[in-house]
Regions:
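Tight coil/turn sites that cap or link beta-strands
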Residues: 7-10, 46, 54, 64
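A short glycine-rich, His/Asp/Glu-containing loop-to-beta-strand
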Residues: 1-15, 21-22
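Short acidic-glycine-tyrosine-enriched beta hairpin
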Residues: 33, 38-56
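Ligand-binding loop in jelly-roll beta-barrel domains
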Residues: 33, 53-79
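A cytosolic small-molecule/anion-sensing beta-strand core signal
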Residues: 2, 28-29, 45
Length: 124
């Protein structure tokens, strides 16, 4: 379980999917937007967003104030990828990104991510 603090209008991750884990976001403060599959939702404090394995998804702060949420990913193991991402010191190309996340059963769609950023006026 990881607590995320997202400034206003920040996208937490590119549109991605993982094949081994289910992901849950429990909203503590603020408003969080999420996309999973073809559906988009907006959730506030006390709401739980379920993002099942194998489905394209991402989430962002949909409000003008900071948001806080708990991310629960089960089963464990994906946290090693997060540690690697936290140690990055420069931006990755789409190809480098895919090479980094593929061993963890993950893939990302950067084109769809940038469309989402534009649609919602997000920072990524």
């Amino acid at each position: 379980m990881v607590e995320h603090r997202l400034p206003a209008k920040v996208l937490a991750a590119p549109l991605h999917k993982h094949t081994r884990e289910d992901e849950f976001s429990f909203i503590l403060e603020g408003t969080v937007g999420a996309k999973f599959g073809d559906q988009e939702v907006s959730a506030g404090p006390g709401n739980l967003i379920f993002k099942p394995r194998g489905e394209w998804h991402t989430f962002w702060n949909a409000g003008e104030t900071p948001a806080r949420l708990l991310e629960i990913i089960s089963p464990g193991g994906l946290e090693e990828l997060f540690r690697r991402l936290d140690r990055l010191t420069e931006d990755l190309s789409p190809t480098e990104w895919e090479q980094l996340i593929a061993p963890y059963g993950c893939s990302a769609d950067m084109k769809a991510t940038m469309a989402l950023v534009e649609t919602h006026g997000l920072i990524f």
